[in-house]
Amino acid sequence: MRRVGWNCLWILLVGPLLFGACAWVDKHAYHTVTADLSVSGPGRISVATRDRRPYVLQQNKGPQFVGTLRSLHYSPFDVTTEDDRPLADGMTQAISNSLAKRGFRPVPVFVSPFESTERIQKMLAQGEVDRAILLTLREWKSDTYADTVLHFDVILIVLDRTEQVIGEKRIQGRDNFPGAYRNASSHAREVVSRAFKGKLEELLNDPAVANALRPSP
C-alpha cells in the first residue's frame, strides 16, 4: 500500500511537468503538405505567403509560431514549425508542392512579415512568370487541450503578368477537432496537418482561383 501510495503521488507531481515538457518542444510540419488540385499546368507561377498575424507583427510571437498546446493545468506552451522556419515559408512551400504535382513550375518567394504589399507584388512579378499567388495570413493558430481548435483567416489572390488581381478567395472561421485528450500532441499534429491540406484545397480549387491559374490559350 505504501509503495502504491508513493507511485500515485509521483504521478500526480511529475506527470504535469512531463506533459509540459513535451508541449514545450511540440512542432507541426507545414512544408511537407501537398494538396490535391483540380487545375493542371503547364505554367510558371510564383508563390509567396505574407504573415499579417497581429502577434507576429507586434513581435509578441515569432514567425515560427503556429499555436499552443496546454498542460494539465491549462498553461499554454508554444507550438512551432517542424523545420524552425517561418510558418509563411512552410505554407509557400506547400503551395509550391501542390502546383508542381499538377505540372506547374512553381517559383517560391520567401518574404518578411514586414514587407509591403507593393514590394511583394514586385518580387512575385520577377522571373517571367505567367501567374503569381499571394497568400495572406490574418490569423492561423491551433489551440489544444481536451480538443484541438484551429483559428484561421486567410486570403489568397492570383495576379497576372501586369500585377492585376484576377482571382481571389478568403476563408475564415474556427474549426473544432475533438479527441485530443487521448494523446494531445500527436492528435494536434494529425488534425492540423489534415486541416491545412483541406484549407489549401478549398482556396486553390475555388472556381475563381482555379480559372485564374489556368494557362492562357
Short names for language-model regions:
Residues 22-98, 208-217:
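A structural "domain/chain start" motif
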Residues 23-35, 112-165:
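Surface-exposed short loop/turn segments
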